Amino acid sequence: MHFENINLKTKNIMRQTLRDRNQHVIGYIDVEFSGRQCLRDSNNHVLGYYEPGRNQTVDSNYHVIGNGNLLTTLL
């Protein structure tokens, strides 16, 4: 698993690149300093969020998907 530090508009974010079995990029998980995670597709469109304080995954429209971190099910 590879993480890289990126600075998006002065936010400290760790980015994990998600790849398929052929090493093609299928998405990214950005982990904010607060612990909140944002799932983006390979075109950088937001697909959903994991809110660790509530232990819930929500889609890009903030509809609850379920309890726990279910981000990769949105890919």
Segments from the language model and where they lie:
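Intrinsically disordered, low-complexity proline/glycine-rich segments
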Residues: 1-75
